[in-house]
Amino acid sequence: MQPRTPLVLCVLLSQVLLLTSAEDLDCTPGFQQKVFHINQPAEFIEDQSILNLTFSDCKGNDKLRYEVSSPYFKVNSDGGLVALRNITAVGKTLFVHARTPHAEDMAELVIVGGKDIQGSLQDIFKFARTSPVPRQKRSIVVSPILIPENQRQPFPRDVGKVVDSDRPERSKFRLTGKGVDQEPKGIFRINENTGSVSVTRTLDREVIAVYQLFVETTDVNGKTLEGPVPLEVIVIDQNDNRPIFREGPYIGHVMEGSPTGTTVMRMTAFDADDPATDNALLRYNIRQQTPDKPSPNMFYIDPEKGDIVTVVSPALLDRETLENPKYELIIEAQDMAGLDVGLTGTATATIMIDDKNDHSPKFTKKEFQATVEEGAVGVIVNLTVEDKDDPTTGAWRAAYTIINGNPGQSFEIHTNPQTNEGMLSVVKPLDYEISAFHTLLIKVENEDPLVPDVSYGPSSTATVHITVLDVNEGPVFYPDPMMVTRQEDLSVGSVLLTVNATDPDSLQHQTIRYSVYKDPAGWLNINPINGTVDTTAVLDRESPFVDNSVYTALFLAIDSGNPPATGTGTLLITLEDVNDNAPFIYPTVAEVCDDAKNLSVVILGASDKDLHPNTDPFKFEIHKQAVPDKVWKISKINNTHALVSLLQNLNKANYNLPIMVTDSGKPPMTNITDLRVQVCSCRNSKVDCNAAGALRFSLPSVLLLSLFSLACL
């Protein structure tokens, strides 16, 4: 820009302002122009005049003071805006606040465009009134009111004025809207006679940035004459909020050996101030790095984006050589584009140097020794390894494999998750007499694959020598269990079998003795020398100690070792049934009426403890020697039931009827049981057995009980 250009601009600006103010003959307090659009130059030069502002309080501007929202500009007493230092960027908006004892107002300067200024002077300074545009045909004239936040006492203070050139006499101004008669109430008020608008308290832009009010004129009775007309109150931002990091904790990870410039994480802060101003324009930097080894500048943060990247060579990002793989960075965010006057906020970024599998595990020695008693199982030795990688990752965790010497799968190896040791275990008992020594070859690897330039070497295998110790093993019965089948009526003293137990310790030449361990019914005896088992009582298949025709007994074989060892053998005796149990009938009591038309007395059932064919079909008979043939009758229903009936009615009394039942065994077995029949008086649906000394059961009840018994078989 030429040196004479500011002067020409100021003259042009003054002429335009004069033309603008000439639209109204009455003086309106405040800036004659509320909004300016200024093209951004390549650089604002110190003490360079940028533009002239025209402010009037209509009373001579006594004690006029200006305040600028940016600390890098000021307004001289003549209204000239100048830069206090050379500066290339100031943000998007500046605000100028003018105040006298009689009036105050705010002007907005919008910075637009690029660095090169082209076009006419009118293109450089574009004047615009924010309201009203275009000018409306109405008598109420309002302009937006700009009020800085955080103003101090005294209150109330005038912040603007409403003009109505055609207002009738005795009419009044009325102000409504949020902040007046709506919550938050009472912030603004208007002088009903003069139209002066005042604020009653300190404003906070971060609570409400714009108040939308309405102005109208009313008569003395409150009736609206004109309006409502919108009145916008804009709260001008002050830099009163520090940047805040709201998304913590901030934890980033970077793989060891990563190339320079690797992005680790992004940290951004929030500033509650106006994002259109430098008050919320943030810049980031690293204030502190802990630890500061091997370089105090391991990381860099993009001042505008907040991206944290590595700035050291991959060799310095070696997790195994670092004193601590965790770095803590104090990140600072500063508003005002990072200028010294800006407010700051800090947060901690924790960066972990993650491990990769660049070290293979190595056994601490080439050979390990172990001893184990024959017959024992469990862990016999722990194999130790070393690995420089991170103990919390699969790059450190070991996986062991038996690659030779385990054809019978008698051994297994697992990793101890706490120590990373290989726990070698015996899972199938070893036999000293078969093999007293075993040699295993063990391989160790990591859970994660190694990086391409690292491989497993000879130190990743080890040999384990295992010595099996001889112990006195108990004798072993063969077969086990031992099974025999005998009839249940086997005579006492009969030999069932001869048991056989052998001593696994064949080299010790020990003797074996036998004894009974469990014989629930007390039926058996065993010869302690030769193991012959015979009976000491009659075997009974129906005994409660027999389960499903099988009797179980246990025997001991004891060797002559010191101390002696014991083996246990099981004998299962299957008992064959013989016809040694007579059948029995049920029920044994019945009732019948003395005048019954149905002469059926009871349905009898029979049961037998023996097994088929020594049970049904049963034969039912009335013992004829004790009962007259012409009174009672028994008829077969099926193989297990028969019907007892009368051939004629009997007087009330108790009768004992001998019933003879015979099973189908060879030879058959017979049982005679008395059936007690009570003949009762049955009158008017009442059964009376008192005269007969009988129980109170009716014939239908007896028949029903008999049928139920039949159904249960």
UniProtKB/Swiss-Prot annotation:
Keyword vocabulary terms for this entry: Calcium, Cell adhesion, Cell membrane, Cleavage on pair of basic residues, Cytoplasm, Glycoprotein, GPI-anchor, Lipoprotein, Membrane, Metal-binding, Repeat, Signal
So which domain of life are we looking at?
A: Eukaryota
Instruction: Extract one GO cellular component term from the record.
Output: extracellular exosome
Identify the tissues in which this protein is expressed: Highly expressed in heart. In the CNS, expressed in cerebral cortex, medulla, hippocampus, amygdala, thalamus and substantia nigra. No expression detected in cerebellum or spinal cord.
Q: Where is the signal peptide?
A: 1-22
Task: Report a single Gene Ontology molecular function.
Answer: low-density lipoprotein particle binding
Q: Sorted alphabetically, which SMART domains does this protein's record hold? A: CA, Cadherin_pro
Q: Which residues form the propeptide?
A: 23-138, 694-713
Q: How does it assemble?
A: By contrast to classical cadherins, homodimerization in trans is not mediated by cadherin EC1 domain strand-swapping, but instead through a homophilic adhesive interface which joins two elongated EC1-EC2 domains through a region near their Ca2+-binding sites to form a tetrahedral, X-like shape.
**Protein name in the entry:** Cadherin-13
Native organism is: Homo sapiens (Human)
Q: Which gene encodes it?
A: CDH13
